Amino acid sequence: MASLINQAAWQPKARTRSLQVGPGPTPSPNEHEIVIKVAYAAVNPTDWKMQDTPYFELEYPFIWGTDVAGTIVQLGSEVTQFKVGQRVIGHCDSLLTRKVTNAGFQLYTTVREILVAEIPDSLPLANAAVLPLSVSTAASALYVQLDLPFPSLSPKSTGKRIVIWGGSSSVGSSAIQLAVASGLEVVATASQANHDLVRSLGASQVFDHRAPSVIDQMASVLQPGDYVVDCIGSPDTQAKCGELVGRIGGGTLPVMLWPQGGLPQNVRAVFVNGLDPGMVNLDVGNAVWRKFIPEALAAGKFQAKPDPRIVPGGLEKVQEGIDMLRQGVSAQKIVIEISRSE
């Protein structure tokens, strides 16, 4: 096929808050990659954190972006599960590969097949764009770090409860739904305004994370062997989740921030790598991305939450979206309209 004419929002150098829109890399998928024309791309905390204080060295100019929704335009030679024209979501992993072709903030991105999922026609692309990184991160916490049963449309009860701290967050929204689909009863935290949202995702009990007695309240409904996941990733939430795990006998605590220390001796905090399902634990990627997510979305048993806060205007608006998230949002995800596809 003819070469695709690409455009991208480039980070010209480290530690600058000014993306530059210009010609993007020409997609050339390997045998297991898929080229997606991006309709919408979501903004994640990683984008502004990498812009302000990179976790590691990169060669610049670079392109950010991990969450995309759009239409397949090209397939690698060994890709058999998908076809050109399908509506899909994709988890872009340029921070792993260090290749700008694998980034999300561009008109055409190249994504590994294991991190692509078909979406039903009933799900708007803008809503679908909130899912990729949150699904991968939640899956890593639940199935890599905690070794829970893989999700199913007809789960069997495990008799266990799991605390999802930050239930209305992007990762928390996916974690609640995956945990329920794995046969666990979910206990979550959220601000009072978001309790109904969190219950609609499947949480049986919701506690106000601001309540002074929240640890006591939650510990009273848990037993040794139950689980806790910190989906917020701040020093404060890590400390509170660590205290809660310690109160119920100890165990593994998946966290979204590097372990800070100072936790009870019976608590082992482990950092959750959202790239894991497509990088190391491919059985998790296959179980979640290839099997469960497409089936659950089609059956109406998985919601694309939180709702998107759409920023129209194309690639020129990516920096604006990053700045908006840097200032903070609640129960929403910033989604940039990259191109008009529906």
Curated annotation (Swiss-Prot):
Its EC number is 1.-.-.-. InterPro entries: ADH-like_C (IPR013149), ADH-like_N (IPR013154), GroES-like_sf (IPR011032), NAD(P)-bd_dom_sf (IPR036291), PKS_ER (IPR020843), Trans-enoyl_RdTase-like (IPR047122). Monomer. Substrate binds at residues 133-140. Trans-enoyl reductase; part of the him gene cluster that mediates the biosynthesis of himeic acid A, a ubiquitin-activating enzyme (E1) inhibitor. First, himA, together with the trans-enoyl reductase himH, catalyzes the formation of apolyketide chain, which is then condensed with leucine by the NRPS activity of himA. Dieckmann cyclization and release from himA gives a tetramic acid intermediate as the product of himA PKS-NRPS. HimG then catalyzes alpha-oxidation of the tetramic acid ring, with a subsequent rearrangement to yield apyrone intermediate. The keyword Nucleotide-binding applies. NADP(+) binds at residues 46-49, 168-171, 191-194, 255-256, 329-330. Belongs to the zinc-containing alcohol dehydrogenase family. It comes from the Eukaryota. Keywords: NADP, Nucleotide-binding, Oxidoreductase. One of its GO terms (molecular function) is oxidoreductase activity, acting on NAD(P)H. Pathway: Secondary metabolite biosynthesis. This is Trans-enoyl reductase himH.
